[in-house]
Amino acid sequence: MASSSSSPSSRRYDVFPSFSGVDVRKTFLSHLIEALDRRSINTFMDHGIVRSCIIADALITAIREARISIVIFSENYASSTWCLNELVEIHKCYKKGEQMVIPVFYGVDPSHVRKQIGGFGDVFKKTCEDKPEDQKQRWVKALTDISNLAGEDLRNGPTEAFMVKKIANDVSNKLFPLPKGFGDFVGIEDHIKAIKSILCLESKEARIMVGIWGQSGIGKSTIGRALFSQLSSQFHHRAFITYKSTSGSDVSGMKLSWEKELLSEILGQKDIKIDHFGVVEQRLKHKKVLILLDDVDNLEFLKTLVGKAEWFGSGSRIIVITQDKQLLKAHEIDLVYEVELPSQGLALKMISQYAFGKDSPPDDFKELAFEVAELVGSLPLGLSVLGSSLKGRDKDEWVKMMPRLRNDSDDKIEETLRVGYDRLNKKNRELFKCIACFFNGFKVSNVKELLEDDVGLTMLADKSLIRITPDGDIEMHNLLEKLGREIDRAKSKGNPAKRQFLTNFEDIQEVVTEKTGTETVLGIRVPPTVLFSTRPLLVINEESFKGMRNLQYLEIGHWSEIGLWSEIGLWSKIDLPQGLVYLPLKLKLLKWNYCPLKSLPSTFKAEYLVNLIMKYSKLEKLWEGTLPLGSLKKMDLGCSNNLKEIPDLSLAINLEELNLSKCESLVTLPSSIQNAIKLRTLYCSGVLLIDLKSLEGMCNLEYLSVDWSSMEGTQGLIYLPRKLKRLWWDYCPVKRLPSNFKAEYLVELRMENSDLEKLWDGTQPLGSLKEMYLHGSKYLKEIPDLSLAINLERLYLFGCESLVTLPSSIQNATKLINLDMRDCKKLESFPTDLNLESLEYLNLTGCPNLRNFPAIKMGCSYFEILQDRNEIEVEDCFWNKNLPAGLDYLDCLMRCMPCEFRPEYLTFLDVSGCKHEKLWEGIQSLGSLKRMDLSESENLTEIPDLSKATNLKRLYLNGCKSLVTLPSTIGNLHRLVRLEMKECTGLELLPTDVNLSSLIILDLSGCSSLRTFPLISTRIECLYLENTAIEEVPCCIEDLTRLSVLLMYCCQRLKNISPNIFRLTSLMVADFTDCRGVIKALSDATVVATMEDHVSCVPLSENIEYTCERFWDELYERNSRSIFSYKDEDGDVYWVNWDLMMMLMLI
């Protein structure tokens, strides 16, 4: 497609179509013109012009006054001298660079048009009869040049409607390109494309309002300006208005002023007078307008200017840019485009554009550029400001500037970001600071409890000052976080003791060590610094917190909560030389992992305490007596190995979560736990003795974990809370669950390695159950009735050695995805006629007594049976029609697959080791198949017709000793990357009329009957032919231009090696060791010792199973300094080797 930039404003037409009326006027062309018209694209039509042999002057003028010509080549196009003369004129404009041209091929082959052959060529030759030679040459030149341009071949599109829309969008993008000045904003085209889709510009009747929403500095206004510039030519009446906050009590005057500004802009009348409301609606009711309102923060501004879409004419578009999502909701703007932060890759491109004027930074700047992008959190404003400030500086200057960039905010960035903060009310400003200084990354539910705020968080999220993730976490952009902390720091005037929040280690150390804290301090969060230093992290005196009477949030050691740190003595990082005698009474959050104290101060009353988190501590007990714990909602003392007792919980009536897991010294739970009637989560795995009678009052308990725990008493388990959603009890000592337990809320049951013999009697209401883990329960004889387990997705029973069968009710588990029954030694049979269409994984490995496997309807991506081949019967009706989407079926006695085998959904077929003579008759639909493994199928005499396996990437036929050749249908495997046929000793030849365009690896090693050098792909990179009967390396080996590795050692029959092998510039290794029959090889050739720097890539499977130890291990030893690996988008692993030596080894 031509890329002319010539588009003078004097052009009358956007598009000139050249076409054969008899072919397309009433069909394709009419639809295309309608689509262009919907996009406000002015298309010339030849109504009223009488066609003749001589092109009319009106048409010549129209062609010259069009910005784009669309030439529709069809069957009869070349039959018209009129069309051909039009084409000549279009060709002239194109060659002068005055016009863009888009060729469209409607039912004709582009090459036929280009070469004037085929049916199109026959028609053209007939038209050329009796025509002057110079005229014919002009036609030929025009046809050849125009058809060579990038265009659209309608034969390749899914539907004609799709292609019409595609062409119309292409024309629109070329007519209305991205304006100059926005090129540095990498990715802006994608934003504009998405917004234009929402605007539905092809609809001429609709009046549409769209919101563009996102945080400050993310590029909303830039995107809006670029979009406005691109759309402006399609709207005669248009206006771009930026909201400016005003103060004053004259609300009416302010509204009239807004209306005047909009109308003056849109009508082009500077002296317009407005003395009453509603003039916007009156003046613009019948006008098609484009209005963009930027930086809107006032609902009245919207109501005044764009109160309703009906105020404007058909086809109008209103775009509102704001940081406040609630404002859009209030104005009932439902179509909202959220501008999200760019990806890391895009951010790096942006910083590179601003700093270096190109898409990627120089190699020695990459790390620095990446750090700058991280410092500004990929915020486009930050990328622009810092990138521009670093432009033209050398690396040393970048390095010198980094400390300042890490610690200080740029004034321009801070000024922009502060606008959103300044617009908040006083209460929400405080909330903003709390999150910036302390609660960034916390759960929303947790912050609501600690700050006693609900509405404010929603407000901050709507104003893009925080983001609430789908998992319920609060995320604040790091530049906003830095802004909030700077605001708190500024109020203290350099005195850390007067700040509300202390998060800097040096500030905390000064305040805590010197005991200078004041009542201003609300929160202290000790950062995880100096973890591995020899000196203590923090020295805390016995009364360090005494002056901080209003301290509510104390977090010490919020580093990773894994047990590793206890191994290296993290407790020593906090030094309490006199212990601790005081903790502020108003504490709501006390998080002190690895606390070295044996107990908390006796003066601490915990009246306001909401969260107590002290994992991996040295606590032996928390406190003496009963404390007023009415506010406490979470207590987490997990992995506190010295903890011998937990306090009286009589007054902890609001406690919702209690974690005592792995408290190895804790023997039992106190009876007072029954008072925690709101307890929803109880983790006490490893607590030695549990009286589960204490659970009887916990009617709200949903999550119970008692792994490794014994049960008090000998009467068995008599009660489990009814509302349990998750029960985790590995190594459970009971024989069955209580008969009165109703599992209607149960989502996950995990009782691995238990002593269970059965779960319960009868049928339970298991509609909520999704996961059941009973593996390793060697006494389990039966699993319960699953009739009502309609949502069960995972059932793990492997190692259940006493299990004999599955209940027929499993057929009701139609959503079952995973069924694992490995090593069920006594399993004898499955229920008949199973319908498990959702099943993706079925494993029956190690089930030696399973003697029949009846019909099963499922959709597997993995299926494995690995038992003794003499102990399984498989009937011809083994598979129903809707077979697994993937199949791994080993050691089967069938001579061929069942006649009803339908593998259309199959992605991975592994029947290695089977006794098949052939897989199936005829052609199967294998469009989904990506990998096929028939290895070690010694009876296999032919592989199936693979004509339709167009997506197959890997084919393994190793050890198929009865295979003599491959069918020519493998030529359809255009995506095949690897073909392995090692030790196919019966293989004599491969097809010679195929070229597998994607094949990189071909392994025929050990094919001792193969006499002919394989030439089935010109893209081969690795060719393994050792121990074959090949007699000659032919001269056409030079066609294998990508060949990097050729192994042919021990080819005893090899007699001739063509010198053309030296023309292979990519060849790095050629091994002809022990080829004793060579009579003409390289006797007069000079061995190449080294080659220029280059890269060779050999793809390996995800499991690195094709390691080719005989070669790669040797290379690695020699080149280990320069080998690295990576995975491509399909998961293929690549070894990349630099500076490899070429080895030509002969004896």
Curated annotation (Swiss-Prot):
One of its GO terms (biological process) is defense response. One of its GO terms (molecular function) is ADP binding. The active site is at residue 86. Its EC number is 3.2.2.6. Keywords: ATP-binding, Hydrolase, Leucine-rich repeat, NAD, Nucleotide-binding, Plant defense, Repeat. Residues 11-175 form the TIR domain. It catalyses: NAD(+) + H2O = ADP-D-ribose + nicotinamide + H(+). Residues 189-446 form the NB-ARC domain. Pfam families: LRR_3 (PF07725), NB-ARC (PF00931), TIR (PF01582), WHD_ROQ1 (PF23282). Changing residue 389 to F: In the gain-of-function mutants chs2-1 and chs2-2; seedling lethality when grown at temperatures below 12 degrees Celsius. Dwarf plants with chlorotic leaves when grown between 16 and 18 degrees Celsius. LRR repeats lie at residues 548-573, 584-606, 608-629, 630-653, 655-676, 698-721, 722-743, 744-766, 767-790, 792-813, 814-836, 837-860, 926-950, 952-973, 974-996, 997-1017, 1018-1042, 1044-1064. The TIR domain mediates NAD(+) hydrolase (NADase) activity. Self-association of TIR domains is required for NADase activity. Interacts with RSH1. TIR-NB-LRR receptor-like protein that confers resistance to the pathogen Hyaloperonospora arabidopsis isolates Emoy2 and Emwa1 (downy mildew disease). Plays a role in the regulation of temperature response during plant growth and survival. This is Disease resistance protein RPP4. It comes from Arabidopsis thaliana. The gene is RPP4.
